[in-house]
Amino acid sequence: MKQRITVTVDSDSYQLLKAYDVNISGLVSTTMQNEARRLRAERWKAENQEGMAEVARFIEMNGSFADENRDW
């Protein structure tokens, strides 16, 4: 679902993008999606940092389950 918002932008940038027929709404939407994805990944990493450290310690002590299948 889309939501209408109002943003304030630099006039020169707006005019240039408009002159090149850039879909400004699409550009803003894509930029917002990318930032939301980055923020979710950052939050996930913070929430799971302890678990990832525990897995790293386990692998350090016991090796990886894939070690026996490595050919390199």
Curated annotation (Swiss-Prot):
InterPro entries: Post-segregation_anti-tox_CcdA
Organism, scientific name: Escherichia coli (strain K12)
Keyword tags: DNA-binding, Plasmid, Repressor, Toxin-antitoxin system, Transcription, Transcription regulation
Keyword Transcription regulation assigned: yes
Homology family: Belongs to the CcdA antitoxin family.
Effect of residue 22 to H: Partial loss of operon autoregulation
Protein's GO biological process: negative regulation of DNA-templated transcription; protein-containing complex disassembly
Record's comment on post-translational modification: Degraded by the Lon protease.
Location of region: Interaction with DNA: 3-40
Annotated stretches, region: Not required for antitoxin activity, or rejuvenation: 1-36
Protein name per the record: Antitoxin CcdA
Subunit architecture: Homodimer in solution and when bound to DNA. Three CcdA homodimers bind to the promoter region and contact each other via Val-22. Forms a complex with toxin CcdB; there are both high- and low-affinity binding sites for CcdA such that both CcdA-CcdB(2) and CcdA(2)CcdB(2) complexes can form. The CcdA-CcdB(2) trimer is sufficient for rejuvenation, whereas maximal operon repression occurs with CcdA(2)CcdB(2). When the CcdA:CcdB ratio is lower than 1, a CcdA(2)-CcdB(4) complex is formed which is devoid of repression activity. In this case repression is alleviated and both proteins are produced.
Superkingdom classification of source: Bacteria
Free-text disruption phenotype from the record: Leads to cell death and induction of the SOS pathway. Additional disruption of ccdB reverses this effect, i.e. no cell death nor induction of the SOS response. The double disruption leads to increased plasmid loss.
Biological role stated in the UniProt entry: Antitoxin component of a type II toxin-antitoxin (TA) system which inhibits the post-segregational killing (PSK) of plasmid-free cells, also referred to as a plasmid addiction system. Labile antitoxin with a half-life of about 1 hour in the presence of CcdB. Binds to and blocks the activity of CcdB; will also remove bound CcdB protein from the CcdB-GyrA complex by forming a CcdA-CcdB complex, a process termed rejuvenation. The N-terminal 36 residues are not required for rejuventation. Functions as a transcriptional corepressor for the ccdAB operon, repression also requires CcdB.
MF-aspect GO terms: DNA binding; toxin sequestering activity
Region called Interaction with CcdB, residue ranges: 41-72
GO cellular component: toxin-antitoxin complex; transcription repressor complex
